[in-house]
Structure formats: C-alpha cells, structure tokens
C-alpha cells in the first residue's frame, strides 16, 4: 500500500478538515494480505493515524517504509517493523528492494514540526525472473516539478510503472512549489522514460482550488497516445510489462 488513508477526513480531527468526496474502493477488512506499506511524508492526506492503527490491527507484522524522521512516530502508533531511509538509501526485504528517492515538497503535522521529517518517493524493484512481471515500480509521492527528478531516471533506467500525482495544483502561484499539474505530469512521464504510468493524487479529497474532476480532464487532453492511465477509484487495470498495454 502507498500512503493509505481510509477515513473521511485528511485532518488531525475527523470533525474538521478536507473531507473525502469519493469513498474508498475497499475497506480495510476487505483488503487481501498486505506485506508492505510505503509512506512518502507526514501530511495528513498521506499519513493517517487511524488508517495505520487499523491496518496494524489486521496485519500486525506488516513492514512500513518511511523517510527519515518518521520511524519514532510509527513505532509509537504500534508498528513492529519500521524501516527508515534517507534519499537514495535502499533496503531489500523478501526479494524486494526499496529505494527512497528525492522529491521536492515539505512536511509538517503541526506548526511546531515544519520540515522536521523528510519527504520522498519510492522505487520498488523485484528480482523475480519473470518477463511478464513488473520489476520496477516508482511511486512519486508528493512533489512539484524539478529538473533534479531526472536523476531518478538515470539511476533507474527501466521503470515499468510510475505512479504520478496529477491533482491539488491550483492556484499555481501557490501550489507550483508543492504539487505538479497534469501538463507537468506528462512532462515527467517523458523524462522518466517509463513504460507506463497511472495517475494518482486526484479525485478523493478537495485539497486545492481546482474542481475534483479537472485533473483527469486535463491529463486526457495532454497525454496523447502515451500509456498514462486514469483509473477511477474502485477500478482496476492489468499492466503487461512487455508491451505496456492494458489487458
């Protein structure tokens, strides 16, 4: 799972704050076996206390990957297995290599801990020798556009599937230093040289000024014939590693 949030608000309180506009596709009770969670940073729409607690109750031995500065909090919440990494650090667990990658964002959960923990993306690589299985997955997390992100493509030249955010970008004068917009998402798709991508970070919470469905509309307008897929919440797609076609 990536940055799981199953509750109705992305907020320290379930009484106020950004409210979920689209229900989760599955409840925690309906999930299949989950072995790993990767966390990109500590903002409330990415790191949710109640979701983590309930996931730990169902999957007590789950391994949680976090950027620097978050391990202590996850252990306090009841996690048994937490791995904390700096940018470009990597760890291999059960045949999967997890690498924390740079992002351009920020962190806080109150006025008193701004940028006290790191933010990152994650590259997950499998060493399974199967030509049809995805071998390299890149979860971008939250980031604005930065030319430095090209370094990720240099270090990981064969990204099978990228999870690229497209929402929470308006107004640009304020959000351009925090989140990419759909046009930049397409630019990053090209610069990463990934085989295919799925759009994330849209359609669930109203976090910025754009309408909830605008990110998808703009991505459809910009992406052309690229294998950059939009999946509605509750939908699913099978990705073929060889030709990046949706089956």
What are these regions (language model features)?
Residues 2, 63-64, 80-89, 160-165:
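Short hydrophobic/aromatic-enriched beta-strand-loop microsegments
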Residues 4-6, 42, 103-105, 141-143, ...:
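Active-site metal-binding loops of divalent metal-dependent hydrolases
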Residues 10, 47, 108, 172, ...:
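Glycine/Thr-rich phosphate-binding loops of Rossmann-like dinucleotide-binding domains
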Residues 28-31, 36, 51, 63, ...:
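Cap/insert and terminal regions of metallo-dependent hydrolase folds
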């Amino acid at each position: 799972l990536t940055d799981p949030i199953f509750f109705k608000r992305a907020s320290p309180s379930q009484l106020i704050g950004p409210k979920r506009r689209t229900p989760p596709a599955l409840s925690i009770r309906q999930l299949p076996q989950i072995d790993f969670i990767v966390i990109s940073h500590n903002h409330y729409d990415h790191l949710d206390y109640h979701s983590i607690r309930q996931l730990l109750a169902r999957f007590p031995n789950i391994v949680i990957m976090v950027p620097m500065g978050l391990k202590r909090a996850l252990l306090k919440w009841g996690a048994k297995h937490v791995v904390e990494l700096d940018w470009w650090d990597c760890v291999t667990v059960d045949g999967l290599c997890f690498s924390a990658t740079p992002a351009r964002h920020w962190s806080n959960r109150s006025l008193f801990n701004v940028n006290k923990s790191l933010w990152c993306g994650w590259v997950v690589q499998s060493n399974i020798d199967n030509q049809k299985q995805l071998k390299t997955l890149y979860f971008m997390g939250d980031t604005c556009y930065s030319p430095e992100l090209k370094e990720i493509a240099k270090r990981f030249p064969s990204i099978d599937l990228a999870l690229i955010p497209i929402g929470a970008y308006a107004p640009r004068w304020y959000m351009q230093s925090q989140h990419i917009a759909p046009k930049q998402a397409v630019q990053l798709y090209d610069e990463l040289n990934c085989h295919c991508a799925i759009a994330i970070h849209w359609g669930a919470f109203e976090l910025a000024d754009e309408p909830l469905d605008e990110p998808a509309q703009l991505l459809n307008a910009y992406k052309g014939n690229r294998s950059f897929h939009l999946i509605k919440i509750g939908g699913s797609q099978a990705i073929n590693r060889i030709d990046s076609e949706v089956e």
